């Protein structure tokens, strides 16, 4: 089994990102490996997942943990962003109480970004913090949501407004789990991969440009997929290590997310999934950067073409409420002193942050995205 370990050397809780095809079978032994774990984990493990993911991978994960000597239980939540609520967290708490989970116990998130965010927040807050492990099964979660310790749930007024920074003990990425991922969800993850190419890793962007097909797993050569996963995870680890709690640099990881979150909110989290909204946010951010003379038209067009090639949306619906965007943007977590901070590219592989974006520039960018 080919294995890659990427360290995330945070001072309070360093951990490893393990990338390995077939790695689910090694989860139990890696959690017992003291070279990977700074503390000895307790026997009780609760795996949180959703029914679809559990059907495919639950038995493998449960067997791996049991064979390593853990006492394993599982708890299933419905799939989807609409269930990422405090009510779902309460259900995890209730089950944790039934199982008498202790501070040495471990919550394992087996699933996509929604499951990871909720499980992490439950781990951060149950008994003021218990062990937490990420086992992402979607591309988006593998390259973004599972790394860096952001956890939380949505509030009716905005996305991820309730949350905490809480680092996992291990992130296990098994590319084989992408075989059962819906094509639309694969494309959603590719939006985050494209983001890393724009903000951090020009070579990754060029690798993606060189791929004939970036829109489906089955068209992605295994060595290219491994390179994409490794480069994306390394980019996220590099940024998080320098700025764990988003005091400065880490904000660049929100490229495409400022307007993307507003699009998700204004369309009721139903029309676009998270990755699609991020893609639309990147299109808008590129237009804003060009209008402000921060970015060249040529580079913006390269990004646009890559997003289109990947099968991600670049247009908004004709009835999209542009006039409501300003109010939603003010609930964004990056707002500082009442000003919305935008992450904008200056060249491929480089990014900057500004709170000096005139409202008419934002409106112009969004109007240009309204579909025919």
Swiss-Prot record:
It comes from the Bacteria. Pathway: Metabolic intermediate biosynthesis; chorismate biosynthesis; chorismate from D-erythrose 4-phosphate and phosphoenolpyruvate: step 2/7. One of its GO terms (biological process) is aromatic amino acid family biosynthetic process. Its cofactor is Co(2+); Zn(2+); NAD(+). It is found in: Cytoplasm. GO terms for cellular component: cytoplasm. It catalyses: 7-phospho-2-dehydro-3-deoxy-D-arabino-heptonate = 3-dehydroquinate + phosphate. Catalyzes the conversion of 3-deoxy-D-arabino-heptulosonate 7-phosphate (DAHP) to dehydroquinate (DHQ). One of its GO terms (molecular function) is 3-dehydroquinate synthase activity. The gene is aroB. Coiled coil: none annotated. It holds the Pfam family DHQ_synthase. Belongs to the sugar phosphate cyclases superfamily. Dehydroquinate synthase family. Its EC number is 4.2.3.4. This is 3-dehydroquinate synthase. InterPro entries: Dehydroquinate_synthase, DHQ_synth_AroB, DHQ_synth_fam, DHQS/DOIS_N, DHQS_C. Keywords: Amino-acid biosynthesis, Aromatic amino acid biosynthesis, Cobalt, Cytoplasm, Lyase, Metal-binding, NAD, Nucleotide-binding, Zinc. HAMAP family: DHQ_synthase. CDD domains: DHQS. Binds 1 divalent metal cation per subunit. Can use either Co(2+) or Zn(2+). Zn(2+) binds at residues 192, 257, 274. NAD(+) binds at residues 113-117, 137-138, 150, 159, 177-180.
